[in-house]
A protein has these predicted regions:
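Short, well-ordered alpha-helical microsegments
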Residues: 89-94
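RNase H-like nuclease fold core
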Residues: 1-85, 191-192
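Tryptophan-centered motif/residue detector
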Residues: 6-9, 66, 183, 218, ...
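Basic, amphipathic alpha-helical segments enriched in Lys/Arg and hydrophobic/aromatic residues
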Residues: 197-256
Length: 256
């Protein structure tokens, strides 16, 4: 399978979650070394299996670029998406909402981890991420707010850490109108973290690619290897899918 094959293969009608992995690397283009964004879209289907549904290396990231690529999802079969797990990207977010207006936008703990670790000491970063994870997995909003308030109180003298926490907390709190299971499957699991770290470390291992073609070939090889290892994403999947929110059930019925 080539990168283009992932962008053209037939897809399922409904995905419970689409996890967007964002990476950066460097590519030599006409004797210049340029930063290159990589986006890997991974879908979680109704049977609890992950699959790569698209790999993108935009030369220039614009709304127009993503309008073309996300519209391609519909032509390949995706009629609805229950939840998207991503870091905030204004282009992708806008275009996905245009095509799938009822989708739930969930902040990705894995991407928050990677976006923030360079700005906080290792010790504090472990604590902040552990406690944000507890907020995300809390059974009720009230329980989540207790964990959040304790965390903010612990770091009340550190303005940077408080700003980082508050940048994401409202998006996490908004998810509490959905079931506990709907929140937990949005990319917080150890399986997703290992998957993300495996892909990230292999990309960083190269550092500089001599061309976009070389980058695409390398991505093709490492993603084929990674995808071959994937098993059902969540244990007791049948029980979880039965306890998901009623609006997921409505989406399924609409497609039957």
């Amino acid at each position: 399978m080539k990168i283009e094959d992932w962008r053209n293969k037939e897809l399922e009608k409904l995905y419970v979650n689409v996890f967007i992995l964002e990476e950066e690397t460097y590519v030599r283009i006409k004797e210049e070394i340029k930063k290159q964004k990589i986006y890997i879209f991974i879908g979680l289907n109704l049977k609890g299996y992950k699959e790569i549904i698209g790999v993108y290396t935009p030369e220039e990231e614009t709304t127009g670029y993503w309008i073309q690529e996300i519209a391609n999802f519909k032509s390949r079969g995706i009629e609805d998406i229950f939840m998207i797990c991503m870091i905030n990207n204004k282009w992708i977010k806008k275009v996905i909402k245009m095509n799938y207006p009822e989708v739930i936008m969930a902040p990705s703990m894995i991407e928050i981890y990677n976006k923030t670790r360079k700005y906080i000491s290792n010790k504090d970063h472990r604590i902040v991420m552990r406690e944000l994870g507890r907020v995300y997995r809390a059974l009720t909003l009230e329980e989540a707010k207790v964990v959040y308030n304790n965390l903010v109180n612990e770091y009340k003298e550190n303005k940077l850490i408080i700003q980082i926490i508050n940048k994401y907390i409202d998006d996490i709190f908004r998810l509490f109108k959905y079931s506990h299971h709907a929140r937990v499957i949005t990319g917080n699991s150890g399986n997703y973290n290992r998957m993300r770290n495996n892909i990230s470390s292999k990309i960083k291992k190269v550092g500089l690619f001599e061309s976009i073609k070389e980058l695409k070939y390398y991505l093709n090889e490492i993603l084929k290897e990674e995808e071959s290892k994937w098993k059902p994403s969540v244990k007791r999947w049948d029980k979880i899918i039965n306890e998901m929110d009623c609006n997921l059930s409505e989406k399924i019925l609409d497609l039957i």
